[in-house]
Swiss-Prot record:
Matching PANTHER family: RIBONUCLEASE H2 SUBUNIT A, RIBONUCLEASE HII
Domain RNase H type-2: from-to ranges: 10-198
Organism of origin: Shigella boydii serotype 18 (strain CDC 3083-94 / BS512)
Keyword Manganese attributed: yes
Gene of this entry: rnhB
Family stated for the protein in its record: Belongs to the RNase HII family.
Function: Endonuclease that specifically degrades the RNA of RNA-DNA hybrids.
Binding site for a divalent metal cation: 16-17, 108
Protein name in the entry: Ribonuclease HII
Intracellular or extracellular location(s): Cytoplasm
Keywords: Cytoplasm, Endonuclease, Hydrolase, Manganese, Metal-binding, Nuclease
Cofactor binding annotation: Manganese or magnesium. Binds 1 divalent metal ion per monomer in the absence of substrate. May bind a second metal ion after substrate binding.
Catalytic activity: Endonucleolytic cleavage to 5'-phosphomonoester
Amino acid sequence: MIEFVYPHTQLVAGVDEVGRGPLVGAVVTAAVILDPARPIAGLNDSKKLSEKRRLALCEEIKEKALSWSLGRAEPHEIDELNILHATMLAMQRAVAGLHIAPEYVLIDGNRCPKLPMPAMAVVKGDSRVPEISAASILAKVTRDAEMAALDIVFPQYGFAQHKGYPTAFHLEKLAEHGATEHHRRSFGPVKRALGLAS
């Protein structure tokens, strides 16, 4: 993979999201400005790390980063805006929540939200840019914990296992029990379960 060349600036924030594909829950984003004086070993795309490693890195990122922030868009916002626009909104919220304003923002993927500072989308950024890797870890650990909490309230759906993604088990339980208030009503399988599909 081509090595990423950083912009000529000091304070760079990385931004990533987790949860665009699930049928339930918020899309969660994170923004992270790392401290060059306190490097963190082993940063990588959160999906390539074990849960144990993600949890350990999450704590290290929170402790060592110059600034970090979480953003989110709730299911009703996803339904109103669509998943792409809701994700952009959640990214804007994460950047706005940083207590140090970044000079430049690097976003995982191929689209940038409108921000008050220069920004660039980086394809496969979660594997190429440590700031984005750190953001991906914070977002995933946060969203996974939310799904585990939701699983306690609604154990019949298996949220702790599939994290809300449309697995065969989730679709079966959706058909059997209907949708919760946390499901995204604009998503096809949920629409069908509610009898709203045309």
